[in-house]
Amino acid sequence: MPKLNSTQAPNLFLLLLVILLCSTQTQCHTKGLRLRPRNQKNMNTTSDRTQNPEDEFMKWVRFVGSLKHSVFKAAKNKLFPSYTLTVHKKSNKGDFTKIQDAIDSLPLINFVRVVIKVHAGVYKEKVSIPPLKAFITIEGEGAEKTTVEWGDTAQTPDSKGNPMGTYNSASFAVNSPFFVAKNITFRNTTPVPLPGAVGKQAVALRVSADNAAFFGCRMLGAQDTLYDHLGRHYYKDCYIEGSVDFIFGNALSLYEGCHVHAIADKLGAVTAQGRSSVLEDTGFSFVKCKVTGTGVLYLGRAWGPFSRVVFAYTYMDNIILPRGWYNWGDPSREMTVFYGQYKCTGAGANYGGRVAWARELTDEEAKPFLSLTFIDGSEWIKL
């Protein structure tokens, strides 16, 4: 068997990393393999780059290689050095004035932990992180000081004049793995829609990749605020605000110490979890959270026939409907969903009026949902 020469080896190494980290055909993790939905649109990467991706990548690494930073496991970050970029409203005080410009400046294929520090201000822009630009951290000066916002809805025309749909309405879209956000607000400025309004889904944040973590962030919107789409995600000490189905998707996510706040005029719902098969290891777990707000709320609606949501050690205000859960108008889903409650408090936590197909969990039943093991967090999160 012929030996690889010195120029072939780096190419092969990069190719293997691309295949392992950035496959566009599946979303997988250690607990299962999930095919992408057929109707999911892939996000195209920048098409106007003409340099060899490896040359471009190594040039950038040499330029900033002396800077140091680490968020996730040191083993992964030892592959290449990491560095920091700054975004500031004033061009003479930062590297960039827009968050998207900072992201676009990175090499086409990125394996370096890049920390983008965003100074205080409201950044009115629509931001999307392409699938191959992994290991990005967005860090604000405080969730109440640093905001990125846009105002698209599912009805907003795209470049071809067609409605862009819920998926593309996101003000901020994460499509690459190992993303971290700290102390920043993601907002969709669309007002609360009238009951029964069509096409008013307006996503503030969409997370469509594995191994994403959010610390001290705010997600502000109305209908469909947080599209917790695919992958394993961790939300710590975050504030999430909306009206109807404002935490939805088919991710495997742990919400710890988060404040969930409803701004519904009348009837709303916190979650719409989309698990569609018993083989899918997805679901939402809320641990030591707080649910407050206006209107009256379901804890969740069965968007997927095997929808799975658990609330544990969570305070619930009196806005929670006694029934707690809604079957999406399909009684057959009552046999397949998994909706649980464990040692919750507050006027809205009274289990006496809950639907018969919800569960008051025992210690043993609740245990898998209470810690980072729910999302294999010890493998990829460094707190």
Swiss-Prot record:
GO molecular function: pectinesterase activity
Pathway, per record: Glycan metabolism; pectin degradation; 2-dehydro-3-deoxy-D-gluconate from pectin: step 1/5
Sites carrying sugar chains: 44, 183
Keyword Hydrolase: yes
Keyword presence, tRNA-binding: no
Tissue distribution of the protein: Expressed in siliques.
Keywords, in A-Z order: Aspartyl esterase, Cell wall, Cell wall biogenesis/degradation, Glycoprotein, Hydrolase, Secreted, Signal
Annotated positions binding substrate: 166, 201, 301, 303
A biological-process GO annotation: pectin catabolic process
Transition state stabilizer, annotated site positions: 223
Pfam families, A to Z: Pectinesterase
Signal peptide (residue range): 1-28
Catalytic activity: [(1->4)-alpha-D-galacturonosyl methyl ester](n) + n H2O = [(1->4)-alpha-D-galacturonosyl](n) + n methanol + n H(+)
Protein localization: Secreted, Cell wall
GO CC term, one of those recorded: cytoplasm
EC number: 3.1.1.11
Active site (catalytic residues): 224, 245
Function of the molecule: Acts in the modification of cell walls via demethylesterification of cell wall pectin.
Family indicated by similarity: Belongs to the pectinesterase family.
Protein name (Swiss-Prot/TrEMBL): Probable pectinesterase 53
Gene giving rise to this polypeptide: PME53
